[in-house]
Every structure is written in structure tokens, then in C-alpha cells.
Amino acid sequence: YPDALMQFEQTYPGARVLLMEENYRSTPEILRAADAFIRKNHHRRPKTIHPTRASGAAVRVIYAMDRADQYPWLVNMAASVQEETAVLYRNNDSALPLIDLLDRGGIPYRCRRMDDAFFTHRIVADIRDIIALAHDQTDAEVFLRIYYKVGGGISKKAAEYACQKSRATGGSILRELLGFPQLSQYGRDSAAALLTMLPMLLQDTAAQGLSRIWDGLRYRDYAERQKLDGGKYEILCLLARQETGLEGLCRRLDELQALVSAPSLPCGGGLILSTVHSSKGLEYDTVYLLDVLDGILPAVTEPKNAGQQDQYQEERRLFYVAVTRARNRLYLFACRNRESAFADELRRELPREYIGPEDVFASLNTEPCGKHYRHAEKGGGVIRACCRGQCMVAYASGETEFLTLGQMVDRRAVAWRAPDRPAPAALPREQAALPPSGVRPGQRAVHRVFGPGTVLSFRDPIVEIRFPAKGDKKFVLSDSVQRGLLRLEE
């Protein structure tokens, strides 16, 4: 594609090349960032994009703790969207957790019909098979599909033997497997681990169960050996956050597959979900860029050969397309625990607000993402995402709330602490003893706090003293004297 443009004059001698350098779509703020990004591409004609529109809103970065925090932010935006707004992403997989939340919340959106490639992918199918085997350990068809993918040391002969014995006895295939005479110790350990962990999957939450399959049953090892797309597992984990168990997750996968494969997806409202490829040639008032993360967009971050270099340059052009779909407003996420080469590069091209050291906002000009916040009624929480004075707070109860900084100040829990006061000086040690003549009414006394007074009475161990400024007080005489609080005069 670039070669055809770069070699146009050689292909068509005498041809005239016209550069389209005026942009009528986007604001100068969006074009300035986009042009600075694409200028770093190799193998392109030197040109500069000139905006024709007046200045508009600044490009905004939404800071988030991790990938999962993008989705509730977008759902909150979608609930009140009033103009045509597009969420653009590289792969359809990225949209599934968002579609799940929008559907649960009854929020309208528009989206092209998707294929069901995610739902039929080997990782998704294998994990569902493992869940099915946990429910029915006599299912020979499922067992023969997955026995060599979890653990190891189980031969095909051993697996078929166990299935045959199970059909005859009606017992667990795994228990019958342990009776295979030629089963190695490694295979025996794998079968025992499956026997132990499969029932646990039925008690786990959906998130715990996926983790147990991936790491506990070592399905991750198989997926990596086969070079399968681990991103499918990550999407499953994002979907699992909304489910209490693996059975519910499987039901929801069936529902989502039917939803995205339907001839016409839900429509209405101003929210549009689209891949970047499908958005070419289109434009939207506002654009949110989802999953601009290394390994997704760009898929290749450190090209090692000419083929990967060409792919990387094409990824940069695709990101440029995504950025320039926005007419008026552009938002992109920056996730703290995920690298994003493209988002970081674009951010470096954005103008930075200057705040002088004496400005009242200087103390607020720090990134609050990840900070703790305590609400007066809802208790402690963590700021999971933020953008330009708006914060997404996740509380320990599981509730997520969107607050401005002003609202956070008004609603925060305040802990009060008494001021520190220096302890009164103790009486000199030589004065901290009872007088040799004992204690008698009318005797003069000096208290470290209440000052001078007169003894009214003494009934061991209690002495009662009258202080002109404080009235009558009673003390345990020996304790007060030993601590240096009270001195009796002769």
C-alpha cells in the first residue's frame, strides 16, 4: 500500500502528485497530536496537515489503574451521552466486556454484527470443556478432548482405557485412570491433581475458577506451547468479574454469542462501537480509544525483522486513522499497569498546562489514580481512574462511584485528632515524698496541675484537698506523691 504511493511517479512517468494537506474534519488540537505522531513513520511522503477549523477542546487522557477500569468509565459516559460518540478498538474482543456491561445496564448502543470467533476459539472451548468435566466426570467425549492439555503423563492408551472402564462401571474416568497398570507416576500425579481440583471449580467464583484452570491445572503451559492467543483468557477474566460462578459465566457466554451474532444489534442513542478498520472514512463528534495497549494496538512493539517493521508501520497508520476519526473531542486511556507505546507517544505531543508554584491548584496537580479515599458513608475506596477533575472510586463493598474533586472534598470522612501537648514537668524527686510528720487537716499542698491547696481530710489512702481555683479534689495519696503529681508541705 505505501509502496504504490511512494513509487507513483516511477509507475506513471510524467504524472503529477497533489498533496491533500487541508483537514476539514478535526480541531487543531486533535490534528496537532495526530500529525506529530504520523510524522515519525518511515517510508512516507513529507507533508503537514493544516486544520481549517477553529480551536476546540484539548485531547484528554483518562488515567486508569488497569485495563478493566476502562469499561466502567465508558459505561458511565454512555449512560448520559448526548451527541454522536464512538468507542473505537483494534479487535472485536475488546468490545465484549463493554457490550456485556451495556446490556446489563440497558444502555442503548449501535454496533455492527460480529462473528463468533471469540466464542469458538480453542482457549474458550477448552476452558468450557474443563468446566463441563468438573460437572460430569463420566463424560468420555469431553475427557478425550482435554486430558492431554491439563497436566501430563497420560497416554492416549491410558485415557481410552479409563473411558472404557468408566462406561462399564459408571464411575469417574479419573478414578478409573488411576487403576491403569502402566500409568507413570507423573501421570498418576496429574490424575490425582485433576481429581482434587475439578470439584473445587464448582465452588469457586468465576474469577477464581479461571485462575485455577489457567495456573492450577496448568492449562497456561499448553496454551503457550501451542502459541495460542492468551488475550482470549484475559477477556474471559474481564467477563468473569460480573459472574459469581463458572456455570453462570458459561451461560453468559452463550447469551453474548447470540447477542453479537444477531442480524441486527441493539440500536439507538448516540453511542457507536466499532473497530478502527470499520471506522475508516467515517467521523464522529467524540471518540474514545479503547485498549490502546502493547500487544493489542500495536500488536508488535519491538519489530525484529523487515516483516515486523512493515507491520509496525501499518499499526502506526491504523492508530492515526483512529485518532483522526474525532471531530471535536478525543479521549484515550493510559493504564498504569500496562505499557502503551502509542498512547505514551501521543501524550508526549500534548501541550501541558503550566501551573506556577504559588497557584492554589499547584498542590492538586498530582495524579490521584491509585490513591485511597474514605467516604463519610460508604467507607474506604481506591481511585481507579481519573480525568480532568473527575474520579472513579471503587469501594470495598464493590460499588463504583464517579465524583468530581469538589464532591470528594464535601463527602469525605474526616478523622479528628487532639493537638499534642507537652507533659507537665514532674516535681523534683527529693520533693516526691511524704513529710515525716504525716498528713493532717489544714496542711499546705501543691499539685502539679491544680496548684496550691489545703488538706481537708485524710483517710488512708484517700486525701481530700481544697484548691481555691478548682474546688475540692480527692487523690490516692501514695500514688500521687510517687508519680510526682502532689507535694505536701510541713
Residue ranges and their predicted role:
Residues I38-K47, G170-G171, A206, T244-G248:
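Proline-centered turn/helix-capping motifs that create local helix->coil transitions or kinks
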Residues F402-V414, S478-L488:
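Structured surface patches comprising rigid loops and adjacent beta-strands/short helices at the edges
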Residues T286, V292-E399, L403-L405, A413-D460, ...:
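C-terminal accessory regions
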Residues F180-S278, L282-T286, I296-A299, R327-F333, ...:
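Accessory C-terminal helicase-associated subdomains
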Residues P2, P13-P108, A132-D136:
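Helicase P-loop NTPase motor core
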Residues Y1-D3, N23-T27, G56, R67, ...:
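Conserved nucleotide-binding/hydrolysis micro-motifs of P-loop NTPases
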Residues Y12, S55-G56, A79-A207, R220-E224:
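ATPase/helicase motor core of nucleic-acid motors
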